[in-house]
Amino acid sequence: MASGKPKKKNPRLASGRKRVRQDVKINAANTSLRSKYRTAVKNVEKAVVAGDKAKATELFAKMQAVVDTVADKGIFHKNKAARDKSRLSTKVKALAAIAA
């Protein structure tokens, strides 16, 4: 049985070959940023679950910068970024209310 994806043809034109080279670099950069985004969100969620208000607040501030950067570059849609920030903000504020 054949594998799922057909083998890609190599581009003939120089511009096509250049595009392939660029795509490899861009894909690696996007993958790295996507991973950084998810890690930042997970770290805030872990701090919230642990009940650590100070750490959650600190990590949330750092997470916002990462989320905004990724949204500006178009790796994740800006509405998804806003939604994630809003949901985590609510959790961090609830944690602060419980601790107070």
UniProtKB/Swiss-Prot annotation:
InterPro entries: Ribosomal_bS20, Ribosomal_bS20_sf. Residues 1-21 are annotated as: Disordered. GO terms for molecular function: small ribosomal subunit rRNA binding; structural constituent of ribosome. Keywords: Ribonucleoprotein, Ribosomal protein, RNA-binding, rRNA-binding. Residues 1-20 have a biased composition (Basic residues). Binds directly to 16S ribosomal RNA. Belongs to the bacterial ribosomal protein bS20 family. This is Small ribosomal subunit protein bS20. It comes from Albidiferax ferrireducens (strain ATCC BAA-621 / DSM 15236 / T118).
